[in-house]
Regions:
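Polybasic, low-complexity association/targeting segments
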Residues: 73-82
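ATP-binding/phosphotransfer module of carbohydrate and carboxylate kinases, centering on a glycine-rich
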Residues: 1-66, 70-71, 95, 115-121, ...
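Solvent-exposed beta-strand sheet faces enriched in polar/charged residues
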Residues: 77, 106, 259-263
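Phosphate-binding/catalytic loop of phosphoryl-transfer enzymes
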Residues: 81-180, 184, 321, 325-338
Length: 338
């Protein structure tokens, strides 16, 4: 028996949000768990995470144990789903599980785009653990990037920012590079005294190198008063501009009024110099562009894409934005306290 209108999944490299909503936009449940990127866990491993969260969501909504179909539409927008073959593999696996009558699978950047605009088209750039960009034209054409990291020319995720900060701190300490406040701020974050001590800790495994991703907010903060940190942030701005510019060019939108939405942990709340640099850089190629952070979470976009498939009207979409936005804010507060 169908129990919900939409099963929506925002599966990222650090966390997964799962929502159940009705066709009228009413939110039945929103739960959060660990990462579910197929790139890191494989398809079965990623869907095992989703399945566990789905059971939790069904219990929260008092909709039973999850046996059989749970929704009309399932929209799974997941990090690490970058090629059609990967989309197909996840879609087939979800269909085999029988969660929904209709299954849509795509990269999580599409969720950011849908969350940020009512137009249904535009460009979105996400910067979380990595960096990615998608574009959708008013005619339905897509512009995408493989987004596999350095092997596909990418730079600008939170990990890249953090690693650049660690490198700059080390070079400041030994004199190969300019002096920077990162020399003190970076090791202090890890409760060590010097960049050399930090390097030894990473080398010996006492400090997990993946934790450098946690330094992204520190880099943005230091950039206000430190030239080296500001240069790292300017590099990020140039990469965001390059991705969005190429997407706009492919879709022939450089002369059109068009929105570029920014999302992901690094860009979600971007303002000040970074936003200004992205805006001014893009306007050189697309003078009518509007650049802004998306106001809604990616899980909202995933759920809205499901409502789109159900042909839900504006009242249902507005209700979804309102209720799921409030539920997400509560989830974030609990996560922060925890």
């Amino acid at each position: 028996m169908t129990r919900a209108g939409v099963l929506a999944v925002d599966g990222g490299n650090s966390k997964t949000d799962v929502a159940l909503v009705n066709a009228d936009g009413a939110v039945l449940a929103l739960v959060r768990g660990a990462l579910s990127s197929p790139q890191h866990l494989g398809v079965d491993g990623a869907l095992a995470v989703v399945e566990g969260l789905l059971g939790e969501a069904l219990r929260e909504a008092q909709l039973g144990d999850g046996a059989g179909r749970v929704a009309h539409v399932a929209t799974l927008l997941m990090a690490g789903v970058d090629f059609p073959a990967e989309e197909d593999a996840v879609r087939v696996a979800v269909e085999q599980r029988g969660w929904a009558q209709s299954v849509h699978v795509g990269n999580d950047t599409f969720a950011v785009l849908r969350a940020g605009t009512e137009l249904g088209w535009g460009v979105a750039v996400t910067c979380g653990a990595g960096i990615n960009c998608v574009g959708v034209g008013p005619d339905g054409r897509h512009a995408r990037f493989p987004a596999l990291g350095a092997i596909t020319g990418d730079w600008g995720g939170g990990y890249d920012l953090g690693l650049a900060a660690v490198s700059a701190a080390a070079r400041s300490e030994d004199g190969r590079g300019p002096r920077t406040t990162l020399e003190r701020a970076v090791p202090a974050y890890f409760d060590v005294t010097t960049p050399s001590e930090l390097a030894e800790g990473i080398h010996t495994g006492r400090i997990d190198q993946r934790r450098v991703i946690e330094l992204a907010p520190l880099v943005l903060a230091e950039a206000a008063d430190d030239a080296v940190a500001a240069e790292i942030v300017q590099h990020l701005a140039s990469e965001v501009v390059a991705l969005a510019r190429v997407a706009l060019t492919r879709l022939e939108l450089t002369q059109e009024p068009v929105e570029v939405l920014l999302g992901g942990g690094v860009l979600q709340d971007v303002d000040g110099d970074l936003l200004a640099a992205i805006d001014s850089g893009l306007r050189k190629a697309a003078p009518n562009v509007t650049v802004r952070p998306t106001a809604s979470a990616a899980i909202v976009g995933a759920a809205l894409l499901g409502l789109d498939e159900l042909e839900a009207g504006p009242e249902a979409q507005a209700r979804l934005r309102r209720e799921l936005g409030a539920a997400f804010s509560q989830l974030e507060r609990v996560a922060t306290v925890g």
